[in-house]
């Protein structure tokens, strides 16, 4: 049996130049596996703790405490363990080495979700190496998934909200090539729409409007959210993919939810007179008008993470036609997913491994969601690294959808390129989710 010989963590940098954690797991057969953790800009209040150092170095964002926790606490405790035993190792780290709990479960407040996750991801890669199988297959075996499917990519091509320095309140405007017949073709469609969008924006708003945001999407200085949708519609038409490429949105509404329970669509304006504040009901009606006019198939975080009332209304009224995705609402937390399955505020899970902090808990959240008939979208964070784990995760769990930015910026393309390699490796066994992106496989 191959076992863990040592674990080494270090501080590296994410795509925004902020520190993050990377971990190497060395095995006693001389091989090693490496994983790095991403971090988000618009974070949900219910996410597991991302441990930062505070103080003045790195604007308080150093991760030397988390690195130390891996090197001095987690690492030594894992020596001699079998890396193929993912669930046992994750549970040992989360429940015994850390052991902190809040009302939503294991909150990782002692060691940090970033410390635990770096090791959890590296263990998963090491387990695949030991079994001499691809990472996506190892993940499928851990989860008990028999049918692997390549996801539909959701390219975030217009950035607003906390990801961009423009006035746009809503955070992401995405394109999904559901009409492609393979992942390779989906990439072609996405890339061509992206380049058409660039020329449309340049012509309408000038050269500097094609500067890109954190996730590689364009950030033109428009204020009307509808204008973002109109730009996408035009670019899709110009590329010749009307009907084959559809639209998704991530509103990240918690970012502009106010204490009086209104939503401020002008929250980024310095001299804000409050004239753009609207009620949850009015915001719901705005979404419904968008859905009536544009080929929208997915809306993520349409309301604040605690505004379950409007979430539920939206899902009841539009849930058949459009998937309502919970991100800040669910934070990939099995307990919150269970509550949502019981109360119906949404009908899809956004899967972000660093919100919960371990591979095992992420798989649990996905399996629960699939059993409830929900869609699942695997996701990057806005502060990313070159690590491609989520590409394999999306195939291994047959999520059916993945969002990892625009077809621009290497830390985003790293994931998409890995999916191209996986599709090639699977050969004639490769299945692309396409129009079945919400339910690509039977629950496992």
From Swiss-Prot:
GO BP annotations listed: glycolytic process
Keyword set for this entry?
Answer: Cytoplasm, Glycolysis, Lyase, Magnesium, Metal-binding
**Protein's cellular compartments:** Cytoplasm
Q: Name one GO cellular component term.
A: phosphopyruvate hydratase complex
Q: What class of enzyme is it?
A: lyase
Bilayer-crossing regions: none
Q: What is its EC number?
A: 4.2.1.11
> PROSITE patterns annotated for this entry?
ENOLASE (PS00164)
User: In the UniProt entry, which residues are flagged as the active site?
Assistant: 215, 352
Give the source's domain of life in one word.
Eukaryota
Q: Which residues bind substrate?
A: 163, 172, 300, 327, 379-382, 403
Q: In which pathway does it act?
A: Carbohydrate degradation; glycolysis; pyruvate from D-glyceraldehyde 3-phosphate: step 4/5
The cofactor(s) it depends on are:
Mg(2+)
The cross-references to InterPro entries, in alphabetical order and at most eight, read: Enolase, Enolase-like_C_sf, Enolase-like_N, Enolase_C, Enolase_CS, Enolase_N
Subunit structure as annotated in this protein's UniProt entry: Homodimer.
The protein depicted here goes by the name Enolase
- Species of the source: Mesembryanthemum crystallinum
The upper taxonomy is:
Eukaryota, Viridiplantae, Streptophyta, Embryophyta, Tracheophyta
Q: Name the gene that codes for it.
A: PGH1
